[in-house]
């Protein structure tokens, strides 16, 4: 099992602004696919069903929603 720390924050000029931030955590299986992981993260944060740009790099996930000026960062907890 893997625990993910998730941060949702606003953007300003395309960069994370941290004017406000919401933090979550979720636990997933070790062998979860990238698609299933992104769906889980979006579901936990309340952004499921909204299209965004996703970048997955091993133990880091970034999901950007340019229309909403929001970004989600997810990191594996060590």
Describe these PLM feature segments.
Residues 14-15, 25, 61-63:
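Generic low-polarity alpha-helical segments
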């Amino acid at each position: 099992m893997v625990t993910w720390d998730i941060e949702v924050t606003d953007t300003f000029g395309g960069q994370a602004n941290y004017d406000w931030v919401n933090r979550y955590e979720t636990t997933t299986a070790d062998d979860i696919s990238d698609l299933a992981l992104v769906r889980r993260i979006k579901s936990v944060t309340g952004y499921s069903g909204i299209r965004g740009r996703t970048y997955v790099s091993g133990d880091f996930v970034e999901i950007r929603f340019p229309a909403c000026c929001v970004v989600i960062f997810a990191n594996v907890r060590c």
